[in-house]
Design a protein with these regions (language model features):
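Hydrophobic alpha-helical segments typical of transmembrane helices
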Residues: 35, 86, 170-171
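Rossmann-like NAD(P)(H) cofactor-binding subdomain of soluble oxidoreductases
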Residues: 1-64
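Structured helix-beta-strand junction loops
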Residues: 22-23, 97, 178
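Internal alpha-helical scaffold of NAD(P)-dependent oxidoreductase catalytic cores
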Residues: 19, 42-47, 62-166
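Short secondary-structure capping/turn micro-motifs that flank functional sites
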Residues: 57, 110-111, 172-173
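Basic, nucleic-acid-binding surfaces and adjacent catalytic neighborhoods in DNA/RNA-processing proteins
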Residues: 166-178
Length: 178
C-alpha cells in the first residue's frame, strides 16, 4: 500500500524500489488520477492496482484526531468484471485484516468520480476557507463546487472516461451527507 501525498510519491518510489519483488502487488491510495500510471511506469513488471480510500472524515483538533466513520478502501484492476488473482489476493488480505474494502467493475470511473468530488469540494474549501458543512449550506459555494465538478466531467469526456449522470449523482449523494 502506497499512502502518501502526491508530492511525496517519487520519494516513496525511491524508498521502496529495493523492496519490490516480482510478485509484489502495489496498491496506491492517493487522491487524483495519475498515481497508478506513475507507479506502473516505475514498476513495469508488477501489478499496480487502482485504489482510493473513502469515508475518511478525520478531524484534528489540537493534538487529537477523531474518526467517526470506518474508512473503505476501493481498489482493483481497470476492469473487474472478473477479478484477477492479484485483486483477489489483496481482497483476501484486506478481509483477513478486517479492513473494509470494495472492488468495483470500473475502477477508472471510480477513481475519476472521487477526483471529481475532491476537485469540487477541496478547491472551493481552499479558496473560501469554508468547511464542508458551510459549503453544503451556502448556495453560492455549492454553485462553485458544481462548476468545478462539471469541468472534471468535461475533461473526462475528452479523456474518453465519460463520467455520466450516475457518477454525478453519487457525488451529490456524498455532498448531501456532509
Amino acid at each position: 500500500i502506497i499512502s502518501v501525498k502526491n508530492y511525496q510519491l517519487q520519494s516513496a518510489i525511491d524508498d521502496i524500489k529495493n523492496l519490490v519483488h516480482k510478485n509484489t502487488i502495489i496498491l496506491p491510495l492517493l487522491n487524483g488520477i495519475v498515481a497508478k500510471d506513475i507507479l506502473q511506469d516505475a514498476f513495469k513488471d508488477n501489478q499496480v492496482l487502482y485504489g482510493l480510500a473513502i469515508k475518511i472524515d478525520a478531524v484534528k483538533i489540537g493534538n487529537k484526531i477523531t474518526q467517526t466513520n470506518s474508512a473503505i478502501i476501493q481498489f482493483g484492476d481497470a476492469n473487474n468484471k472478473e477479478m484477477s488473482e492479484g485483486v483477489l489476493a489483496v481482497k483476501n488480505l484486506l478481509n483477513d485484516a478486517k479492513i473494509n474494502n470494495q472492488v468495483f467493475e470500473d475502477m477508472i470511473k471510480t477513481v475519476w468520480t472521487k477526483w471529481m468530488l475532491n476537485i469540487g469540494l477541496n478547491q472551493v474549501s481552499a479558496i473560501s476557507a469554508a468547511t464542508y458543512g458551510v459549503i453544503k449550506n451556502t448556495p453560492e459555494l455549492l454553485t462553485l463546487v458544481d462548476k468545478a465538478m462539471k469541468e472534471v466531467m468535461n475533461v473526462s469526456q475528452v479523456c474518453d472516461i465519460n463520467l455520466g449522470d450516475r457518477n454525478w449523482q453519487s457525488v451529490q449523494d456524498v455532498i448531501s451527507t456532509l
